[in-house]
């Protein structure tokens, strides 16, 4: 019996080795391709942003930004009535955080520049060289540990003075301000930064800042929100127009002045969600397409094709600004080298244009008459979570990447944010937060979906987990935790969650598989 068992084991091992190495021996590219589609230059990283991480409020010449003012004036709008004056103090603890990155084995780190550290008053004041010095030291420290900086020029925070002087993104002057910021950053950091993005999630920033008014500058009108100023059916599109042209200005500066010598690439980051028609009716299918047009395509179509989506033009008419012939030419010659995709969740979509529809998120004109729902009847769109906007639906992520692949052929993509949020309830213990099995389940499912999309032909070049650390999560304050590392809000001590070890092992496993392929 023992000999028979040994014989069976030998046969099984031979079969496995033949399966792995025996097929297509003449082409190493095919070996283990079913196991790991990640190429050798694929970026595995974590993501952050200046306001959510740095802290160091007004330190070393930093000025007030829009979120400083918003959180100080309106603490009641933040779930825990907090702000990011201290945040997780990465400004002073970045060397410790780079050690955590090294533990994970990531080869890239996505962070953003604090506009207020570099240009406290925009073009109305001087460059703050203490801010330049900080980012130079930070970038050098990352590179010394083999971690590539992946830098966002602006992640929603900007000098409050620009809001006070000319209403920031509602004014074309903001294009000049942003171009000036970009030029300074390329000049001082571009010899080491090879991956740039201009704006983070302009579509989400526009919706929350100018449509519903939940984010600064808190502008909106009924029925979209309750604000003291603003017009939800015109201002989001005016601000978007200026953001898109500001992006093009920054890209043009990089491509004409710096790219040839610095040999980097530049793109933009948008928020995406998968929108699944709630039924097989043509009306709901068309509504799902409108939902995409009024969300991610709103930004991506202009920066890639130089025009707004047809669905937006048809519904909004003259409320949607038009690009001049010169602006179209500038957009065409300032085409992004890649796009960054932030993705967390999915929704069912119900038509509200030709059908009777309840009021709710997405149901009105400026949203495309496409109602967003988390369930149809008793069936939910994936697994619902304690975070009201996040639903676990890896299949939707797979569909989203294929949709982008088909709409923007051959455009390289980076998954610049993807992660799972734990809502900290009064009864939640630190032990429960550290034992984050639900986050592991989420990441495993979404990374599997990513691999499937890459096998389908999606040109994805990197994946960044949101986030390295628990941090200030906007209106949720510190009550929603996205980090691979737990942060004690009193001591700021960083402690690895189970997901940190899981991600470390995942990276090691796929890098090792890659090495087998490359060396075979």
From Swiss-Prot:
Disulfide-bonded cysteines: 220-227, 352-357
Keywords from the UniProt entry: Disulfide bond, Glycoprotein, Glycosidase, Hydrolase, Signal
EC nos: 3.2.1.21
Pfam families recorded: Glyco_hydro_1
Active site: 201 (proton donor), 417 (nucleophile)
Enzyme class: hydrolase
Keyword Hydrolase: yes
Record carries keyword Hydrolase: yes
Positions annotated to bind a beta-D-glucoside: 52, 155, 200-201, 344, 417, 466, 473-474, 482
Coiled-coil regions listed in the entry: none
GO terms for MF: beta-glucosidase activity; coniferin beta-glucosidase activity
Stretch forming the signal peptide: 1-22
Residues carrying sugar: 3, 226, 378, 435
Catalytic activity: Hydrolysis of terminal, non-reducing beta-D-glucosyl residues with release of beta-D-glucose
Tissue: Expressed in stems and siliques.
Example GO biological process: carbohydrate metabolic process
InterPro entries: Glyco_hydro_1 (IPR001360), Glyco_hydro_1_AS (IPR018120), Glyco_hydro_1_N_CS (IPR033132), Glycoside_hydrolase_SF (IPR017853)
Family (UniProt): Belongs to the glycosyl hydrolase 1 family.
PANTHER family: BETA-GLUCOSIDASE 45-RELATED, GLYCOSYL HYDROLASE
Entry function: Hydrolyzes p-nitrophenyl beta-D-glucoside and natural glucosides such as syringin, coniferin and p-coumaryl alcohol glucoside. May be involved in lignification by hydrolyzing monolignol glucosides.
Name this protein carries in UniProt: Beta-glucosidase 45
Organism: Arabidopsis thaliana
